[in-house]
């Protein structure tokens, strides 16, 4: 058992930890770099430091998964000396030659350093076909502390148990919360104003780099469309993108309203998008698997059981709603 559990950080206060993190969430805003610490997620990774589990960072596109990984590596470098960090970013052409699971395995083994605590970080792991074979083999060697991130379409919560044979822990990253948005805009004290802004801009922090509403909206819309029209279509080989798009728009236009697959299929069919409740039920599951929507089931207090015939759905980020659905339409709908 060569993986050492590090205890030294337990005596360091949380405040001291975060003060030493210099590069947590870097964002270019108005021509300068602004930082914000996302304590909830970083603290979770610190808690899991040295455990045998594979740590899998999941979340919607552009929610900050890669930045979280980078921040944690900075934390390790600033707190421990006898460590060896093996970092692979498959978005970087420098790692093009190891986008094959045998090559990935060999590369990691070649960079292992005996006598040190070895950390393995793999960003955008899905770009290496059959990556799970390499990760599972490295996990079985019991000498690496492993962390991976990937596209939401390839690291779905429902698929993790199938992909990884060893123990794993999912660290789910959301877009900025309203609290984080306030901290990002700490120079503005009017919380009502900030809340109105946040309800429209949302928490996809990459959009804050743009000065105009049009550019911000285009950024968010592109993130959303990549998930719906590319990730899910590719993941599930869907034959009809129109039904998926109309379904997503319907759910966004009916946030927190009770609905069902039967009702949705009837409404879409009546509006020239023929479908059925089985397809709708399956597509809703796909959207939830990709972290675009979250479902809340009705609960029968008397019977103490969940009711299957109707649910409520909530969007992962309010900014997507305003970007994907006509802003004018939403305002008119909300004032009716």
Language model features: what each stretch is:
Residues 153, 158-257:
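Interdomain motor-coupling "hinge/lid" segment immediately C-terminal to the ATP-binding subdomain
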């Amino acid at each position: 058992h060569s993986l050492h559990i590090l205890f030294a950080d337990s005596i360091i206060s949380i405040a001291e930890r975060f003060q030493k993190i210099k590069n947590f969430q870097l964002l270019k805003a108005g021509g300068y770099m602004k930082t914000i610490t996302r304590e909830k997620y970083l603290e979770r990774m610190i808690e899991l430091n040295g455990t045998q589990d594979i740590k899998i960072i999941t979340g919607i596109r552009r929610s900050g998964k890669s930045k979280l990984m980078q921040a944690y590596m900075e934390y390790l470098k600033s707190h421990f000396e006898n460590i060896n960090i093996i970092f692979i970013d498959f978005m970087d052409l420098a790692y093009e030659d190891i986008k094959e699971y045998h090559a990935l395995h060999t590369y990691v083994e070649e960079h292992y350093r005996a006598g040190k605590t070895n950390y393995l970080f793999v960003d955008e792991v899905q770009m290496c076909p059959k990556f799970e074979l390499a990760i599972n083999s490295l996990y079985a060697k019991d000498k690496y502390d492993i962390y991976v991130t990937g596209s939401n379409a390839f690291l779905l919560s429902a698929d993790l148990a199938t992909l990884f044979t060893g123990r794993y822990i999912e660290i789910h990253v959301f877009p900025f919360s309203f609290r984080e948005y306030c901290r990002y805009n700490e120079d503005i004290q009017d919380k009502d104003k900030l809340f109105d802004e946040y309800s429209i801009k949302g928490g996809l922090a990459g959009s804050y780099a743009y000065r105009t509403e049009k550019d911000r909206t285009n950024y968010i819309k592109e993130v959303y469309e990549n998930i719906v029209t590319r990730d899910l279509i590719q993941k599930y080989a869907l034959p009809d993108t129109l039904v998926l798009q109309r379904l997503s728009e319907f759910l966004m236009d009916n946030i927190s309203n009770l609905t069902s697959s039967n009702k949705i299929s009837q409404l879409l069919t009546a509006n020239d998008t023929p479908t059925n409740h089985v397809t709708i039920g399956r597509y809703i599951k796909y959207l939830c698997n990709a972290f675009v929507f979250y479902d809340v089931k009705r609960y029968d207090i008397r019977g103490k059981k969940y009711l299957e015939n109707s649910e409520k759905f909530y969007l992962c980020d309010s900014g997507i709603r305003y970007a994907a659905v006509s802003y004018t339409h939403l305002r008119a709908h909300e004032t009716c």
